[in-house]
Swiss-Prot record:
Annotated InterPro entries: EF-4, EFG_III/V, EFG_V-like, EFTu-like_2, G_TR_CS, LepA_C_sf, LepA_CTD, LepA_IV
Catalysis: reaction(s): GTP + H2O = GDP + phosphate + H(+)
Subcellular location: Mitochondrion inner membrane
Main location: mitochondrion
Protein name: Translation factor GUF1, mitochondrial
Keywords, ordered alphabetically: GTP-binding, Hydrolase, Membrane, Mitochondrion, Mitochondrion inner membrane, Nucleotide-binding, Protein biosynthesis, Transit peptide
Organism superkingdom: Eukaryota
GO MF term list: GTP binding; GTPase activity; mitochondrial ribosome binding
Amino acid sequence: MLASQAIKRIFHRSWKPLVRFNHGKAPTAIESIKKRIEDIPIENYRNFSIVAHIDHGKSTLSDRLLELTGVIQSGGNKQVLDRLEVERERGITVKAQTCTMFYHDKRYGKDFLIHLVDTPGHVDFRGEVSRSYASCGGALLLVDASQGVQAQTVANFYLAYSMNLKLIPVINKIDLDHADIAQAEDQIENTFELPKEDTIRVSAKTGLNVKEDLLPAIIDRIPPPTGCLDKPFRALLVDSWYDSYVGVVLLVHIVDGTVRKGDKVSSAQTGKKYEIKEIGIMFPDRTPTGILSTGQVGYVVPGMKASKDAKIGDTLMHLGREQETEVLPGFEEPKPMVFVGAFPSDGEEFKALNDDVNRLVLNDRSVSLKRETSNALGQGWRLGFLGSLHASVFRERLENEYGSKLIITQPTVPYMIKYYDGHERLITNPDEFPDLAERRNKVQAIQEPYVEAIMTLPQEYLGNVIKLCDHNRGQQTEITYLNMTGQVMLKYDLPLGQLVEDFFGKLKSVSRGYASLDYEDIGYRDSDVVKLELLINGSSVDALAQVMHSSQVERVGRAWVKKFKEYIKAQLFEVVIQARANSKIIARETIKAKRKDVLQKLHASDISRRKKLLVKQKEGKKHLKSVGNVQINQDAYQAFLRR
């Protein structure tokens, strides 16, 4: 999701905030905004999100709406709500954002206050999505006229539908030569049971029908917020970001009551107390209004120092009125589901890099972090992420922000170990995996996490995709032909461990880029998994160990030893590379000792001296091998882990 150096403010912090204080608006302009908000009753509020697959035009449509309502100038902004560099480069949304708009509807002669809450679409950030939807009365279901319904659209539709949002189907990119509007309408009707006549056709790029049809539909079809101004104040914490000047900034939806600058509030989940230092709306940047009331979506600066204290889904309430304020339902702590080891490529850089990693974790409350030490790679960290995309985004941010070079181990997922005595243990590092003796005597079952994967693809690639899913231990649960044009929706139960092994890249490859994917966690299931280790002269290289299904270990083990052999230079002694699982060696490669001619300077007839030198060389090689100090360059680990 991103490409501009100027927009770097919401997700991390060693940069200058893009979600900045709105210095550009003079005090009179801010007073005018405050007065305009005061004059709009809650029944004229409209809060909505946009549900869309990647590249279906969500950011462009957001820009167009902001232009048409006068929030930004025409043509001067691109992807205003995608504030992270990674968001612009990848075309994804990572953090929830909001922007307030004023719209004068000439049909009614009234002003309306509209809050657009931009949400992440990827499953890794589903926590932000569900909290964003909870702030809204409706959503635009955006579908690309040239691509039709895609997996992410389907997954987010069901989430929005389950939260009782009023859905408005919108077909975008109708100006394209290859747009198939009729097909898109058929898919929307067949997949989501939304009538064709409710569909609005637009071009976000040109603005066609956005002002004429879409804005009036938002006013007419999306219901206003249902909160009560007279009840005790409570707000839903939708998202947060860190600002190097003011600390944590909270994105909130005011469910009931009113909150003002200077008010003292408390958190339902942490019990911590804060004083509101600044409060206002995003227009599109931070615009202080001094007050937020029922139904509004805006920001507060509570003087919070650590992002870890900003818990998505938390309830904020007035200090001293906690007993009479009902906590909002649905709060869940985010659970890391993908773990990697991270080590500096240069061990001497650990201290400096440690500061960088901790700074980024400060800005992303959903990353778990703990120090760990590898016998091969030295000091490093074990990082936990919401999913594989989250891990990828974090790594990219670290490299973009600091130019830091890390050795990142292969991603692993958590495994649940169930013991005969009834207790359970969740492991996140292959080093913690029980050995063969423990598994035989104490372990009742080992479980791995599963997901329900939703894929949409052209029918011609169905065979390839089914073969890929079967190869990755998938179990087909549903197949639906979306329409007569050949689009198919597949549902598979897949092990999460297979998904993080670049399943999406393989899916794109076998479908020539036409397949789309989304998934949802469905819990743990019993599995026959084992730990595969790489040994160098009998010593395990801990950083390279992986947990995988027993059916894969021989194939992967053979590939490992062949690949790692390419990156180890010949030593003065023989180097044996082995793959081991269940205490058995399943593959082996040998690097012959580098021969040194110790006889070069001897006279040809000096036979006894020759024998003595050869015996001495043999003893020396035996000693080196027994010590096992094989010299392995860090580049070898990096190259091997890029497999």
